[in-house]
């Protein structure tokens, strides 16, 4: 990870950590850079960059700043307006854009925001390009093996255009609808749109496929995105599904790149459940290429036990859908994701897509003629305790000999009945200590043992 761009882009509190000036510089550099790449390939047409945003009040400010920067550099800006992160990735790829930009801080509160950069393949932008953007933000410009005193401004007819591109968002919706291989007629579906990017798209897709659609948290006002809503506050959807007698519920986050489910009884169906359900579905149909489901180190111990029973292989990556997709692309895997609900179906998308995940869960239910509770039941989730310890030095705390000895002792005590995971946060001064075991008391006991050592060694803030 670089100075500004982490695994989920450049993220921070709007107006403080992430400012309009930052956004202008990102647009300024990308507009110039992709124009320069075109010129080097003998193409004098302006670079084309597609932009989407979520419903935060600050998203409009950042959109205007990005557009000002890129058009000042001579690139054309295509505006999808309020849309989802996966829609930007899809349109960047199928409509031959030089790159895509999504303005969102995902599941964070309204006062945060972020800038996610997507390449022409619909994948997260390469690290080397992100480093060039960061250098420009910091006043350095060394590109194409030479130093540049400053970026030139486009003039006259070479100033970039701004294009209203709602048609791109509609094309994405049409693509999702085309993936619905069964009619949803007669199925009562609840949607929690988190007052975010999916607020209009999700219902339109489900309505088009014939579902009886019931929606909550689809009235964004710029300040209520993720507010007691969506996949990080799923209790609202649980209550809604039970009260309305719905067959299934789906909860998205602010930019709709993740999805969690609620079964007809009001139980939460996590990302691990989704991986299990769809992994088994593909295995039964002989379509689980490489016989592997890709997970992260945070997936539940019970998931691996269940996969072993079904003779399904699995891989574990670092936390982040970026790493999941990289492994999938390199090894030809069809499904992977995270416990949090970032699920990637590589045949259909290059990033996590909450609405697509919903459609795939509907497909399994309808194909097998079983309710979600029955599909999820075989996966026994192990109790888990996670404690975040704020520390002065993440790496020193994690690599401390006494801490490592404590971790080793816990791992040996658990044996094959559970596991311990200690890792540093990618965005905060935090070390995360997580234990999974057959019961909650055992989890808490072993987490406390390791946390106490971290604190006794003087690392805690």
What residue spans do the PLM features occupy?
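Proline/glycine-rich low-complexity loops and linkers
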Residues: 80, 131-173, 178, 264-337, ...
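Short glycine-rich phosphate-binding loop at a beta-alpha junction
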Residues: 43-54, 188-190, 291-297, 432-434
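Phosphate-binding and adjacent anionic-ligand microenvironments
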Residues: 248, 285-461
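N-terminal small/polar loop signature for handling phosphorylated ligands or for N-terminal nucleophile
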Residues: 36, 40, 48-112, 204-262
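Gly/Ser/Thr-enriched, mixed-charge loops and adjacent short helices
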Residues: 13, 113-242
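General beta-strand structural signal in soluble alpha/beta enzymes
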Residues: 5-6, 51, 77-82, 102-103, ...
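An N-terminal, well-structured beta->alpha segment
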Residues: 1-68, 72-73, 162-186, 395-396
